[in-house]
A protein has these predicted regions:
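N-terminal helix-loop segment corresponding to the beta1-alpha1 unit
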Residues: 1-149
Length: 149
C-alpha cells in the first residue's frame, strides 16, 4: 500500500507479465518498472533466470549484480511451464496483464498457449512485445543472443 508521500510513476497501475530472460527483455521491463509499472518476472522455479549466476561481481549477499541491476523494481514468480498448474497460473497472468514481454525463440511459447495469437484471444487489449534476435522474416527461426548479434 502506498504512503501519502510515496511518488508514483507515470506507469503506476500498469501490469507487465515478463517472460523474458538475460538482457533484451529484462532491460525493457526494467525501464517500465522504473516508471512505476508492476512487473512480474516469470522464472524457472529451479534455476531462475540464467543471469542469477553471472559474475563477478557479486553483492555481499552473493547475488549477481548483473541480475540485480536489470531486474530491479520487479516481482518474481517461479513457474514451470511444463507443469499444468503452473502453466495455468502463467496463462492467467498473461490474460490479466496490460503488457506481455517475451524473448523466447520464435514459436517457443506456442505449445504453452502463451504466444501472441493465444494471448490476444483472451486478452485482446494486451500489448504483446516479442523480442527476437533476427526479426520475423528470413532467419527468424535462428536463436539470437545479445552477444551474438
Amino acid at each position: 500500500m502506498s504512503s501519502p508521500n510515496q511518488v508514483r510513476g507515470p506507469l503506476d497501475g500498469v501490469v507487465i507479465a515478463d517472460f523474458s530472460r538475460v538482457l533484451a527483455g529484462p532491460y525493457a521491463s526494467m525501464l517500465l518498472a522504473d516508471f512505476g509499472a508492476t512487473v512480474i518476472k516469470v522464472e524457472d522455479p529451479d534455476r531462475g533466470d540464467d543471469t542469477r549466476q553471472w559474475g563477478p561481481p557479486f553483492t555481499s549477499q552473493g547475488k549477481a549484480t548483473y541480475f540485480e541491476s536489470v531486474n530491479r523494481n520487479k516481482q518474481s514468480i517461479g513457474l514451470d511451464l511444463r507443469d499444468s498448474k503452473d502453466l495455468y497460473r502463467a496463462q492467467n497472468l498473461a490474460r490479466k496483464a496490460d503488457v506481455v514481454i517475451e524473448n523466447f525463440k520464435v514459436g517457443g511459447l506456442d505449445k504453452f498457449k502463451l504466444d501472441y495469437h493465444s494471448v490476444t484471444k483472451t486478452n485482446p487489449q494486451v500489448v504483446y512485445c516479442s523480442i527476437s534476435g533476427f526479426g520475423s522474416k528470413e532467419g527468424k527461426e535462428l536463436p539470437g543472443y545479445d552477444l551474438l548479434i
